[in-house]
């Protein structure tokens, strides 16, 4: 037991921060950076796509649904591979692996965000849209100022689940050797070789704590909102 704890203690800085002192974040730090970056791209992107699908319908909605179904029907690991090889061809240069994975996560997650937010918009009474128009609001203003705030409040639990999934999906970055938590845990295991159980139990516990922390923060927010309401 002491030896198992010692291998974690000896490699804790590397598991948490990677080579941050050398300007190369890794481990838990890189996992969080990729998750936050993908969230900052996927959330507004998904909301904007939901707004387009709700506002215009018809061909626009069908094309957006087709895009979302294609993305959601493909394993994320293939999306990462595609961008890994496609982006250098489009940009004419190599992108950092963490950037490529972050973009893949954002692209993949935006499809789920779009569906969730659109469901929230469609659940609102149609009379609200008509009433806002009679008050002089333009359609875009009605969507932005009246409907979206309500829809986002209603789908917050769904969005939290989506972003917890995103946080766990950062572990797929190991496939292109991005040094996030799963990758550095594998590196430590390959170097030490005799304590894999301790290393990967620790890794799983870190993911569990990160996801539980996000869930608890969201629950407290929901509780405060319900109390205030």
Q: Each predicted region: which residue ranges?
A:
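Transmembrane alpha-helices and adjacent helix-loop boundaries
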Residues: 1-229
